[in-house]
């Protein structure tokens, strides 16, 4: 993870020079695919969770689960469109808080983890050792390329949804570099690889807030959660259905942000064919991963993500197919 993070960071020095590979047609397609692939996860969260043991629970999908998710969605809509200022901007957060409170009143919140959590803890670097595994490093580096493509799409979606403009080369390079450094730091402390959080594309598109100060404040809060486990435990105690209500809105907004970018595309036969083939292979392989069962495991993981084949096809076809002036 550490070396893969450094590789990801290095991609930031080149990604800006490849900006012409990601016009609105490609960037919008990437964001649309991300959003469409995330929506089923949001539905599963609202129903009670996406893990197998949660889905196999007889209570999965019952009204109490969906009721909490709907509370979050309804409160978020009310706050977004019937209030102004900070209340409107914080609509999703207020919806989550309302859903959390309702869940507590319904007795669906277990605070046992909060009681057991420490008040203060310092992360230990390389707690699990440092194992140099060439195969694992190559795998993480390949996934870093996929993550970098997702980052380009996410940054493009953020600038389009939050400021109604295209992302600059500096923004693309900086975002990719920051993702890589974050992954490297996560590897030092035994964490998982980082990637840009596509849900935030929807959140920023909905709120219109893309201030670095706001993001930095959120980062400080996350650090506090890491250093003060009780704070993190309180958040972790939130029922998955409450979170599901929020992410349904955000995942849907991700897809909407991609559609918004595609609205700027001239829809001639060339561009329609690029979208059709890229979308078909991207979503098709994601929905039917068994179609790849005779490929090596690494190839299956990369192609079944849907994002890589969709982005690769869109980039290649956009570069090789001749331009058309008329729709």
Each model region followed by its residue ranges:
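Membrane-embedded alpha-helical modules
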Residues: 2-109, 219-327
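Helix-loop-helix hairpins and the membrane-proximal interhelical loops
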Residues: 54-59, 88-173, 296-299
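Short alpha-helical transmembrane interface motifs in multi-pass membrane proteins
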Residues: 60, 138-142, 181-186, 240-244
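Membrane-interfacial loop-to-helix junctions in multi-pass transporters
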Residues: 66-67, 128-136, 166-175, 209-213, ...
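Membrane-embedded helical hairpins/re-entrant loop segments and their flanking transmembrane helices
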Residues: 141-212
């Amino acid at each position: 993870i550490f070396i893969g993070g450094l590789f990801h960071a290095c991609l930031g020095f080149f990604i800006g020079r490849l900006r012409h590979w990601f016009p609105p047609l490609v960037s919008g397609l990437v964001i649309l695919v991300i959003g469409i692939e995330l929506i089923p996860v949001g539905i599963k969260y609202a129903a009670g969770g996406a893990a197998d043991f949660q889905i196999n629970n007889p209570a999965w999908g019952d009204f109490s689960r969906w009721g909490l998710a709907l509370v979050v969605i309804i409160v978020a809509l009310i706050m977004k469109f019937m209030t102004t200022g900070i209340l409107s901007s914080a609509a999703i957060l207020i919806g989550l808080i309302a859903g959390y409170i309702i869940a507590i009143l319904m007795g669906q919140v277990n605070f046992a983890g909060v009681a057991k959590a420490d008040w203060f803890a310092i992360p230990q670097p390389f707690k699990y050792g440092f194992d140099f595994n060439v195969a694992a490093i190559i795998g993480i580096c390949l996934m870093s390329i996929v993550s970098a493509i997702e980052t380009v799409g996410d940054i493009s979606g953020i600038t389009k949804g939050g400021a109604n403009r295209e992302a600059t080369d500096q923004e693309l390079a900086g975002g990719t570099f920051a993702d890589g450094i974050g992954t490297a730091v996560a590897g030092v402390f035994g964490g998982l690889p980082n990637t840009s959080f596509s849900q935030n594309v929807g959140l920023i598109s909905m709120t219109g807030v893309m201030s670095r100060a706001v993001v930095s404040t959120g980062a400080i809060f996350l650090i506090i959660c890491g250093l003060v486990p009780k704070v993190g435990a309180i958040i972790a105690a939130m029922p998955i259905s409450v979170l599901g209500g929020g992410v349904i809105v955000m995942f849907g907004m991700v897809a909407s942000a991609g559609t918004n970018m595609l609205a700027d595309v001239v829809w001639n036969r060339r561009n329609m064919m690029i979208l059709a083939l890229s979308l078909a292979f991207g979503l098709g392989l994601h929905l039917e991963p068994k179609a790849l069962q005779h490929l090596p495991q690494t190839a299956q993981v990369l192609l079944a993500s849907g994002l890589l084949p969709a982005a690769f096809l869109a980039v290649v076809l956009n570069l090789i197919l001749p331009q058309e002036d008329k729709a």
